C-alpha cells in the first residue's frame, strides 16, 4: 500500500473552492452591503423577524448517556465524560486535552481533539440494532456511516436507516494491549472467584489444575499478606482459598460487573484469564459468558483493540469466522489445553461470509469504462480482503491511465498547423535544415505547389512542431480512450474517415488539426469528470479503509424525555462510540448570521432542512415542530430554522409552516430560501423581512477572485479575469468554480483557458458570426457557426443564449436589435420543442442575412 501516496498526487479529492472560501462572518460577505447592514442591526439588537433569503446548511446531532466512547485511551460512558467536564450544565462546554478516536476521509482510524462537549434534552430517539449485537440510541437527525444495498457508502440520518443497511464499524481500536499480572489475576477472579468479607476469604474454583496453579502463583506475587491453600473436596471439586486483606480491599472496590480500570493497561492478560474461566468453543464459535451486559459490551471494545470483531447476544460474547478465531488465538489464546485444541479446529473452517460489503457496481463500472480499464470483478458484493485487493489493482491501473492521459494532453496541447509567415521569415534556415530549395518553399508559401506530408513534417520540425509525435499521441488516444465513432461524431464525419486520416500518411493537415482539438477537449472532459473523481475517491476508500460493515436488523423510534450528549470534533466530525465500537457523527454549519447571533452556541440553536429533498406537510409537522419545542441554548432568546428551497414546498406544507411560525414565534425565527418569492404564499411573505440578493458587481467578484488566485499561487491575467466576469454574470459561485476549473489546466489563468473550461464561445466570435450574416456573407457565417460548435463543443441552446446576449452589442439600430432578439427567442423555442439544432441555427443566420439585405 506504500505506493498509494503517489496516487494521491492526482488530486482528485481537492475540496471545492466555493466551500473553501465560503464567508464565515457577515464582514466576509462580498457585494451585498445593503443586506449585511440590515443583518448587523439584528446582531446588535439581539432580535430579528422571520427572514426570506438564502444561506448554507448545518444541524447538530447527539447520543444517549449510556453510549460508550474511548477518550484519552480509556473507556467511558458518554454521560460520565460530559457530566464531569460540564459540571452538569446544559449546552456546550469548551474542553482542552480531550482526544477521541475517529476515521479520516479514507476510512483510517485517527486520534482527534475534542473542541467542546454538549448536553441537551429531546423527546424522540432512534434505536438501531445490528446483526453483531450493536445497539445505538441517537437523535433522529444523527448521521451514521453506512453501506447501502446499492453499494453507496454515505452518511445517513438515523431516521432514514433501514434493515439491510450496513453500519461502519472499526476493525481495531488503537488501545494499549499489554500484559500485566494484576490484570490477569482480576481476570481469574471475575471469571471464577468469589469474595466473603465476613470470613476474610477469597475462593477460586476451576477444574483445570493449570489455571488453579497460575492463580496461586499470581496471588503470592501480588499480595504479600496472602495465605493460600488448595483443597479438593469429597465431590471431586478443587478450590483455591486465599486469606488476604489487601486482595479483599481490591475486589470490594470493583463495584458492578465490568472490566476494572486497573485491567486496561494489561487487557491482553485480563482477557486470556477471563476467557479461560468463562469461555469455550460452542459450534463454530468461541463463546464467552459474562456477568452483565456492561461486561459483554466492554469485552467487545477490548477485543477490537486486537482487531477481533465479536458479536453480542445479551450476556454472551461470540467470536466466529476463521480470521477472527485465528486473531484471538494469536493475540490472546487459551491456557486450557482442551479449549485450545477445539478452537484450533475452527481456524480450518471457512468464514460464514458476513465480512463483506455491497459494491457500488454502477460507479466502479463508470470508472472502468471512462478510463478503459482492463482489470475488473463483476461481483456485486466483495469481502473485505477482496475489496482491498481489487480496488488496489484498479487504483494501480487508474494511476497509469491518468498519468498517460496527462502526457497525451501535453502532447496534444500544441497545434500542428505551420505558420507560413514564420517560414517566410526564416526561409534560408528552413531550406538549410530541410534540404528543400528556397524557391520550392516560396511556392509552398504562395500555395502554388502541393506540399507532400513528408516535406510538411520536415518544415514543421524546424519550427519546433513535432507532427509525428502529435499524430502518434492522437492515434493512442483514439485507440485506448475514445473511439473513431465519437471523434467522427464531433467532427461531423464518418468514423471510417477518422480512422483513415489518423492511420494514413497521406493526411489532410487541416482536418488533422481539427481532430487534435477534439481529442484535447475529450481528454480535458475525462480529467475534469466529477463522477470519475467520485469513483476514484470511492476506490481509494475501499483500498485503504479499516472498517467492518455490520448489518442493521432493526430500527425503531423511542418517545419520552431523554438527556442526550455529544462531543464536537472539528474537521472530521466523527468519533468511535456505542455499546460496541461504531463510527458516529457530529457536524457543524457555516451560517454567518447564526455565528454572529449565537457565538459558540450557534450550532445548537440552528436547524437546516431542504424542502426539495423533504417536500410535504410531514416536514413541517414533525421535524420543524420537534426542533421548535426545545428552548434556545446559551442564553439566546430564539433559535433559527433555515428552510432551503422553500418554494419547493407544497401549498399545504406552506400553510402548515405559516401556522408553525405563529405557534412558535416566541422562541423561533425562520429563514426561508427560495428561487422565486412569487411561489411563497402571501401570508408567509407578510411575516418575513424580505432580502433580495442581487447579482454582484464585477469589481466585487474581481476582488475576491484576485484574493483566491493569490492564495492558490495562480497568475490571473486581466484577459482571464474579464473572461470569468463575462461568463459569471454576477454569480460569485459560478466565478469561483470557473477559476478552479481553469486552474486545473494551468497556473496561468488566460481567457483561452476560461472559455475552454466553461464551454463558452468568445463573445467576439459570436459577434463576428452575426455581423457576417448581417453583411450578406451567409456561407462564411455558417462556417463560423460550425467552427464555434466544434471548437467549444457547445449545444445549439448555448449558442442562442450567447447570441441573445451579444445582439445588443452589435452596431445596428434599435428596431433591428428588437426584431433579431425576437427571432432568437422564436428559434430557441423551436429547439426546446425538439427541432434539429443545426438546421435551426443556420435558418436563424439566414434570417440575419435577410434583415441585412433589407438595410
Curated annotation (Swiss-Prot):
Keywords: ATP-binding, Autocatalytic cleavage, DNA replication, Nucleotide-binding, Protein splicing
Domain of life, source organism: Archaea
Disulfide bonds, paired cysteine numbers: none
CDD domains from the UniProt entry: AAA, Hint, HLD_clamp_RFC, HTH_XRE
Pfam families xref list: AAA, Intein_splicing, LAGLIDADG_3, Rep_fac_C
Subunit organization: Heteromultimer composed of small subunits (RfcS) and large subunits (RfcL).
Record's miscellaneous remark: The intein interrupts the potential ATP-binding site.
Descriptive protein name: Replication factor C small subunit
Organism the protein comes from: Pyrococcus horikoshii (strain ATCC 700860 / DSM 12428 / JCM 9974 / NBRC 100139 / OT-3)
Amino acid at each position: 500500500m506504500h505506493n498509494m501516496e503517489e496516487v494521491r498526487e492526482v488530486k482528485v479529492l481537492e475540496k471545492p473552492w466555493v466551500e473553501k472560501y465560503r464567508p464565515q462572518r457577515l464582514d466576509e460577505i462580498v457585494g451585498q452591503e445593503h443586506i449585511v447592514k440590515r443583518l448587523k442591526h439584528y446582531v446588535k439588537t439581539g432580535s430579528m423577524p422571520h427572514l426570506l433569503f438564502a444561506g448554507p446548511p448545518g444541524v447538530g446531532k447527539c447520543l444517549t448517556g449510556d453510549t460508550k466512547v474511548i477518550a484519552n485511551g480509556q473507556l467511558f460512558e458518554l454521560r460520565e465524560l460530559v457530566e464531569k467536564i460540564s459540571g452538569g450544565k446544559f449546552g456546550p462546554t469548551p474542553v482542552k486535552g480531550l482526544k477521541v478516536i475517529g476515521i479520516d476521509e479514507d476510512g483510517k482510524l485517527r486520534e482527534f481533539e475534542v473542541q467542546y462537549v454538549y448536553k441537551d434534552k429531546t423527546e424522540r430517539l432512534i434505536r438501531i440494532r445490528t446483526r453483531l449485537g450493536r445497539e445505538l440510541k441517537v437523535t433522529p437527525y444523527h448521521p451514521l456511516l453506512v453501506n447501502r444495498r446499492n453499494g453507496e457508502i454515505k452518511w445517513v440520518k438515523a431516521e432514514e436507516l433501514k434493515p439491510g443497511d450496513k453500519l461502519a464499524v472499526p476493525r481495531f481500536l488503537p488501545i494499549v494491549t499489554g500484559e500485566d499480572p494484576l490484570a490477569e489475576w482480576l481476570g481469574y477472579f471475575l471469571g471464577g472467584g468469589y469474595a466473603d468479607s465476613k470470613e476474610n476469604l477469597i475462593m477460586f474454583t476451576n477444574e483445570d489444575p493449570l489455571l488453579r496453579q497460575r492463580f496461586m502463583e499470581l496471588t503470592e506475587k501480588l499480595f504479600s499478606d496472602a495465605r493460600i491453600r488448595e483443597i479438593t473436596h469429597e465431590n471431586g471439586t478443587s478450590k483455591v482459598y486465599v486469606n488476604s486483606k489487601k486482595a479483599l480491599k481490591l475486589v470490594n472496590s470493583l463495584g458492578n460487573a465490568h472490566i476494572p480500570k486497573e485491567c486496561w493497561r494489561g487487557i491482553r492478560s485480563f482477557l486470556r484469564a477471563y476467557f479461560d474461566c468463562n469461555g469455550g468453543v460452542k459450534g463454530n464459535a468461541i463463546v464467552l459468558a459474562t456477568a452483565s451486559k456492561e461486561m459483554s459490551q466492554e469485552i467487545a471494545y477490548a477485543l477490537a483493540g486486537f482487531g477481533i470483531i465479536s458479536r453480542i447476544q445479551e450476556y454472551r460474547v461470540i467470536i466466529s469466522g476463521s480470521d477472527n478465531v485465528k486473531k484471538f488465538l494469536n493475540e490472546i489464546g487459551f491456557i486450557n489445553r482442551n479449549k485450545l485444541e477445539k478452537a484450533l479446529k475452527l481456524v480450518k473452517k471457512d468464514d460464514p461470509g458476513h465480512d463483506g460489503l455491497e459494491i457500488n457496481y454502477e460507479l466502479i463500472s463508470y470508472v472502468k469504462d471512462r478510463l478503459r480499464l482492463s482489470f475488473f470483478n463483476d461481483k456485486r458484493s466483495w469481502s473485505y480482503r477482496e475489496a482491498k485487493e481489487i480496488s488496489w489493482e484498479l487504483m494501480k491501473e487508474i494511476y497509469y491511465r491518468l498519468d498517460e492521459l496527462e502526457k497525451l494532453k501535453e502532447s496534444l496541447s500544441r497545434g500542428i498547423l505551420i505558420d507560413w509567415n514564420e517560414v517566410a521569415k526564416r526561409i534560408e534556415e528552413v531550406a538549410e535544415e530541410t534540404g528543400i530549395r528556397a524557391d520550392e518553399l516560396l511556392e509552398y508559401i504562395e500555395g502554388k505547389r502541393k506540399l507532400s506530408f513528408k516535406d510538411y513534417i520536415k518544415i514543421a520540425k524546424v519550427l519546433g512542431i513535432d507532427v509525428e509525435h502529435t499524430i502518434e499521441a492522437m492515434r493512442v488516444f483514439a485507440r485506448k480512450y475514445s473511439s473513431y465513432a465519437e471523434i467522427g461524431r464531433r467532427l461531423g464525419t464518418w468514423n471510417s474517415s477518422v480512422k483513415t486520416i489518423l492511420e494514413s500518411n497521406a493526411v489532410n493537415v487541416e482536418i488533422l488539426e481539427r481532430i487534435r482539438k477534439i481529442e484535447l477537449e475529450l481528454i480535458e472532459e475525462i480529467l475534469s469528470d466529477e463522477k470519475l473523481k467520485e469513483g476514484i475517491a470511492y476506490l481509494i476508500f475501499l483500498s485503504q479503509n479499516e472498517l467492518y460493515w455490520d448489518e442493521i436488523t432493526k430500527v425503531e423510534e423511542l418517545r419520552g424525555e431523554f438527556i442526550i450528549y455529544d462531543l464536537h470534533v472539528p474537521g472530521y466530525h466523527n468519533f468511535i462510540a456505542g455499546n460496541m465500537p461504531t463510527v458516529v457523527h457530529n457536524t457543524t454549519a457555516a451560517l454567518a448570521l447564526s455565528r454572529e447571533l449565537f457565538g459558540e452556541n450557534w450550532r445548537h440553536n440552528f436547524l437546516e432542512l431542504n424542502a426539495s429533498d423533504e417536500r410535504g406537510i410531514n416536514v413541517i409537522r414533525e421535524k420543524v415542530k420537534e426542533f421548535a419545542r426545545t428552548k434556545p441554548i446559551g442564553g439566546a432568546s430564539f433559535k433559527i430554522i433555515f428552510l432551503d428551497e422553500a418554494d419547493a414546498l407544497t401549498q399545504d406544507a406552506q400553510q402548515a409552516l405559516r401556522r408553525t411560525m405563529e405557534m412558535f414565534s416566541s422562541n423561533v425565527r425562520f429563514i426561508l430560501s427560495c428561487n422565486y418569492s412569487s411561489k411563497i404564499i402571501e401570508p408567509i411573505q407578510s411575516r418575513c423581512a424580505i432580502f433580495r440578493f442581487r447579482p454582484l458587481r464585477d469589481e466585487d467578484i474581481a476582488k475576491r477572485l484576485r484574493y483566491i488566485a493569490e492564495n492558490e499561487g495562480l497568475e490571473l491575467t486581466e484577459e482571464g479575469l474579464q473572461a470569468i466576469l463575462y461568463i459569471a454574470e454576477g454569480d460569485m459561485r459560478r466565478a469561483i468554480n470557473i477559476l478552479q476549473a481553469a486552474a486545473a489546466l494551468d497556473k496561468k489563468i488566460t481567457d483561452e483557458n476560461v472559455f475552454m473550461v466553461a464551454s463558452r464561445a468568445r463573445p467576439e466570435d459570436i459577434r463576428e458570426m452575426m455581423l457576417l450574416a448581417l453583411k450578406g456573407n451567409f456561407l462564411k457565417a455558417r462556417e463560423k457557426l460550425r467552427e464555434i460548435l466544434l471548437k467549444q463543443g457547445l449545444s445549439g441552446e448555448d449558442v442562442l443564449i450567447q447570441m441573445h446576449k451579444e445582439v445588443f452589442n452589435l452596431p445596428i439600430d434599435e428596431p433591428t436589435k428588437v426584431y433579431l432578439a425576437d427571432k432568437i427567442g422564436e428559434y430557441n423555442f423551436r429547439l426546446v420543442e425538439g427541432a434539429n439544432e443545426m438546421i435551426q441555427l443556420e435558418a436563424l443566420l439566414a434570417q440575419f442575412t435577410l434583415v441585412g439585405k433589407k438595410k
